[in-house]
C-alpha cells in the first residue's frame, strides 16, 4: 500500500528538500488548513449547528451576510492572529484590514481570504469553500497599511482554496504546481491525493450564468453563441454548459477535468469592471489555474498582471483551459 503523505509532511518536504518555502510560510499554511477543518465541521453540521440562514448584517460589498460567512471569517482571524506568521489580514467580509494586535508577535506575511465563497448555496447544500492568498509584506517601513496589500497577483507566495463538498479538499500552490489534499476525518489531517494537477488545453465544457446573456459584451456573446452552435457551428464540436454559482466548485471541476469559467463584465453596471473580487477570488484562483497549465484573463490582460488600486477591487474573470481562454481574449481584441 502506497504511503499516505499528510499536508504537514508535504510542506516540510517543500521547505527542506526543494527549498521552495520558508518555515514561517509553512507554519502559516498549516494554520490556514486547521482553520479550514473547523469551518468544514461547522458547514457539515448545517441546521443541527444552528448555522444556516442569513445574519442581520451586510458586508462591505453591500451583500447580506450568511451566518456561516461570519463564523468562517471569525475562525480564520482567531486561528491566524496569534501565530507570529502574519502582519495583517484582509477579508471580503471586512471593510478594512485587520492588523495583528500588539499583544501578539508580528510576522512578515499578509493573508487575504474569502471566508466562504458561494455562500448563497449554503442553505441548499451545494459545495462552497474558502479561498485564500498569501503575500509578503513590503519591507522598508514599520507597521502595516492597506497599501501593503495592493500587490499584483504575480507577487503571491501561496494561494489555494478548501472546498466543502462530498469530501473536504484543500487545493494549494506555492509556485511549484498544484497539489490536492483530502481531509481524512478519522485521521484528522489533510492527505495528499494528487500532485502536479494539469488542465487540458482544450475542452468541451463552459461555465457561465446564461440568464445574463442579454447583458454581455459582444466578444463574450460571440464565444458562447459559437459553443451553442455545436457541430454545425464554426467550432465543429458540441459543448456542455455547467454553472454552480459557486466559484470554488466551478474552478474545482475545471482543475479536475478541464473547462472554461466566465464571469464577464456586463451592461447592467457599466462603470464596474466585473463582480468577482480581484484580491480575494480572482488572484488566488488565477494563480492556481496558471500553475496547472491553464490561463486567466479579464478579457484583455492577464489577471495576475493587474495592479490593484483598492482592497475590494472587482474584476471580470475568464479562466480555465488555455486554448479556450486565449480564444475569448482574442475576441476581445477584435480578432
Curated annotation (Swiss-Prot):
Annotated CDD domains: FBPase (cd00354)
Main location as per UniProt: cytoplasm
A biological process from GO: fructose 6-phosphate metabolic process
Pfam families per UniProt: FBPase (PF00316), FBPase_C (PF18913)
Residues noted as binding Mg(2+) 2 in the record, renumbered to the chain: 114, 117, 281
Cofactor: Mg(2+)
Keywords: Carbohydrate metabolism, Cytoplasm, Hydrolase, Magnesium, Metal-binding
Cofactor stoichiometry and binding remark: Binds 2 magnesium ions per subunit.
InterPro entries reported in the protein's UniProt record: FBPase_C_dom (IPR044015), FBPase_class-1 (IPR000146), FBPase_N (IPR033391), FBPtase (IPR028343)
Enzyme nomenclature, EC number: 3.1.3.11
SUPFAM superfamilies: Carbohydrate phosphatase (SSF56655)
Source taxon at top rank: Bacteria
GO CC annotation, single: cytosol
Pathway: Carbohydrate biosynthesis; gluconeogenesis
GO molecular function list: fructose 1,6-bisphosphate 1-phosphatase activity; magnesium ion binding
Keyword presence, Hydrolase: yes
Binding-site positions, Mg(2+) 1: 92, 114, 116
Compartments, record wording: Cytoplasm
Subunit description: Homotetramer.
Entry similarity comment: Belongs to the FBPase class 1 family.
Listed name of the protein: Fructose-1,6-bisphosphatase class 1
Gene of this entry: fbp
